[in-house]
Regions:
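N-terminal secretory targeting modules
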Residues: 1-91, 281-308
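Alpha-helical scaffolding within the catalytic cores
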Residues: 75, 133-145, 182-191
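Conserved SGNH/GDSL esterase-like catalytic core that processes O-acyl groups on lipids
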Residues: 80-176
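Solvent-exposed, acidic/flexible segments
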Residues: 90, 94-102, 132, 144, ...
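Active-site-proximal beta-strand/loop segments in catalytic clefts of secreted hydrolases
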Residues: 93-96, 120-123, 153-158, 197, ...
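Sec-exported extracytoplasmic/periplasmic mature domains
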Residues: 106, 110, 114, 144-147, ...
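Active-site segments of SGNH/GDSL-like serine hydrolases
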Residues: 154-160, 164, 188-220
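Catalytic His-Asp segment of secreted/periplasmic serine-dependent ester chemistry enzymes
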Residues: 206-308
Length: 308
């Protein structure tokens, strides 16, 4: 081992040399990490992963900015202007409230001369209990047999309960319940569109007389609204303000004694709102003017139009 004045410097203090090498490796590693972070940030920004202008995102909205409404990625099916020669077949129904929607809407559709009503509803049915009544299968059958061009559907009254799915209960309100409920609603919407409906008007739940129901109705409405936004051609029809007072509380004058169902006046009020949505799409230039015939009997006409 050399010990004279000309011995190599590295042999004088090998520990110092190792420390310098370690520092250089750390600096190099830090530079590599920094470069990779910059590249990753650029790729995410180009992919739109940052969401809105502020780049915020949320797992709850699937990477979309908080509060953003999801948009369908395809344009809605084309519609035509409804005429007497080429009328629009409108299926209306759902649960018992959907039945009342149909009762109110049918006379208005018939009187228009350009819309043809088709009605069906099932009491006590809904999205949760397809072991009792399977709306998924029923809607497939309806689209195949009735072949409506437009659908006005209303259900959710009976969905303040757990979901039954192939022998397994999913407790109401849990994350898994919300996921399954949304999936069933979305599947039904897609069934209608795939079955030939060019427009689907999914009517939300109204405010209820029993206050405990309202948070649950709002949960259902929120899920339906979100799914409607994901399906081109589906419109969510909000009727909550329609049956509330000016200060947002329950308005009993339109409702039956159970605080859920509608009076005849309430049915007509609901039908007017849904009919307005139909006309906006299918009769943008207005309806043909009615020309009464000389031998028409007003009493007979009124009686015939009021029957579903």
């Amino acid at each position: 081992m050399e010990t004279g004045p000309y011995a190599p410097l590295r042999s004088r203090d090998p520990r110092r040399r190792r420390r310098r090498q370690a520092r250089r490796r750390l600096v190099l590693l830090a530079l590599v990490v920094l470069v990779l972070a910059v590249v990753a940030a650029v790729l995410v920004a180009r992919a739109g992963g940052g969401g809105g202008k502020d780049g915020s995102s949320s797992k709850a909205t699937g990477g979309k900015p908080a509060g953003a409404t999801p948009k369908p990625i395809t344009p809605p099916p084309k519609v035509w202007v409804a005429t007497k020669a080429d009328p629009v077949r409108v299926w209306a129904g759902g649960d018992s409230l959907g039945g009342e929607l149909g009762y109110g809407l049918a006379p208005v559709l018939e009187q228009s001369k350009v819309f043809m009503p088709i009605l069906y509803y099932k009491e006590s049915s809904g999205i949760c209990r397809w072991d009792f009544f399977d709306w998924g299968r029923k809607m497939t059958s309806i689209m195949h047999t009735a072949r409506p061009n437009a659908v006005a559907i209303m259900m959710g009254t009976n969905d303040t309960q757990s979901i039954w799915d192939n022998g397994v209960w999913t407790a109401y309100g849990k994350p898994a319940w919300k996921t399954k409920y949304a999936a069933r609603v979305g599947d039904m919407m897609q069934t209608m569109l795939d079955g030939g409906a060019r427009r689907v008007y999914w009517v939300g739940m109204p405010i209820m007389g029993e206050s405990w129901r309202n948070s649950r109705m709002k949960l259902i409405n929120g899920i339906v609204k979100e799914q409607a936004a994901l399906h081109a051609g589906v419109q969510y029809v909000d009727i909550w303000p329609l049956f509330a007072t000016a200060n947002g509380t329950y308005d009993a004058k339109w409702r039956a004694g159970d605080g859920v169902h509608l009076t005849v006046a309430g049915q007509e009020r609901l039908a007017k709102t849904v009919f307005a949505a139909l006309k906006k799409d299918w009769a943008p230039y207005g309806l043909p003017s009615a020309k009464p015939t000389p031998d028409a009997s007003p009493s007979v006409s009124a009686s015939a139009s009021s029957s579903p």
